[in-house]
């Protein structure tokens, strides 16, 4: 939060925060200087001086440390929140408010972010939510996969997670060069496996067969 929150996020993410309307959710990513994804996120600007970002809990502390060196030169503070994030399925989502954020994912699927411990109506299981996410081809960064992939490796360029017209941000030169002058050597693809518990996807899982 703070008067510089839009400019900070504009210079550190793959999305355009200068033109983002209030209360509209977007998906984006933070990259390092080599263009590798540190974390993916969903963000909502609740006011011109306040943004809420949802990311994997396992990367939140490392992301805060990464952003700290940029925040010291701005009028912006970053606070780790203990909000709950629920995956829900229903044709009529709840009405959003200051302490309840609703993020549509499909005609009947949506996320609910809230700062209290009570679960909203129509919550589905974590396994069911992950299954729907996998079917949509959504790759999410966890602690084990930080700094490993270019956005194109994860199909972020095909999913609208990169804005190639927004201007400079950390890692932008490498991401843009691949987009305009080359083509990805690998792409994330969906496969079925028989293991009861799958390990995090790694480099070898994105190589072309």
Label for each model-derived stretch:
Residues 1-209:
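Basic, glycine/lysine-rich polyanion-binding surfaces/domains
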């Amino acid at each position: 939060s703070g008067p510089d929150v839009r400019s900070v996020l504009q210079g550190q993410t793959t999305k355009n925060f200068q033109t983002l309307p209030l209360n509209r959710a977007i998906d984006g990513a933070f990259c390092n200087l080599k263009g590798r994804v540190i974390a993916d996120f969903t963000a909502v600007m609740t006011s011109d001086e306040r943004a809420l970002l949802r990311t994997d809990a396992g990367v939140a502390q490392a992301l805060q440390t990464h952003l700290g060196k940029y925040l010291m030169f701005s009028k912006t503070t970053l606070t780790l929140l203990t909000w709950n994030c629920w995956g829900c399925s229903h044709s009529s989502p709840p009405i959003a408010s200051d302490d309840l954020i609703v993020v549509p994912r499909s005609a009947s699927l949506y996320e609910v972010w809230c700062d209290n411990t009570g679960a909203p109506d129509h919550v589905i299981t974590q396994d069911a939510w992950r299954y729907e996410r996998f079917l949509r081809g959504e790759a999410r960064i966890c602690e084990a996969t930080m700094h490993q992939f270019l956005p194109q490796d994860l199909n972020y360029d095909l999913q609208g997670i990169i804005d190639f017209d927004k201007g400079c941000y950390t890692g932008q030169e490498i991401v843009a060069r691949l987009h305009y002058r080359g083509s990805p050597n690998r792409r994330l693809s969906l496969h079925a496996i028989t293991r009861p518990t799958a390990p995090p996807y790694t480099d070898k899982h994105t190589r072309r067969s």
